[in-house]
């Protein structure tokens, strides 16, 4: 589950902060990108051993950032071309997409990984139940 949440840290940094907001700040080191992405070049540390609480603290801050932005965004802003920084960082294929499309990627990833976490928690719960028997 920690790895799934670490991937969402990366999704937030790449698709929300870089594509929706147009920020050029480095990725959060704890994030996990796709396997083909050059981790060190992007400031990522896939070997980091993090607790669930550490990752949840970052995810809470990220969720607050999205909630604050959503409370103020207008339909016109969602329709604009995303201000993706003009550099070679991830995701290169976001250029030319609307802000709404980039936000959609964030929300799709959140929903899909929610399902993965639920699946993993159910599996752990079943394992605990079988060990108690």
Model-predicted segments: where are they?
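Acidic/histidine-rich alpha-helical segments that form the ligand environment
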Residues: 40-79
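Short, contiguous alpha-helical
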Residues: 1-45, 81-133
């Amino acid at each position: 589950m920690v790895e799934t949440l670490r991937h969402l840290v990366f999704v937030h940094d790449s698709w929300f902060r870089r594509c929706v907001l147009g920020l050029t700040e480095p990725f959060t080191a704890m994030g996990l990108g796709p396997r083909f992405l050059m981790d060190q070049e992007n400031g990522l540390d896939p070997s980091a051993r993090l607790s669930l609480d550490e990752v949840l603290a970052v995810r809470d801050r990220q969720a607050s950032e999205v909630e604050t932005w959503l409370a103020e965004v207008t339909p016109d802003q969602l329709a604009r071309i995303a201000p993706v920084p003009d550099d070679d960082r991830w995701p290169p294929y976001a250029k030319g997409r609307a802000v709404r499309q980039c936000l959609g990627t964030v929300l799709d990833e959140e929903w899909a990984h929610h399902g993965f976490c639920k699946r993993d928690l159910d599996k752990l719960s079943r394992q605990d139940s079988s060990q108690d028997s």
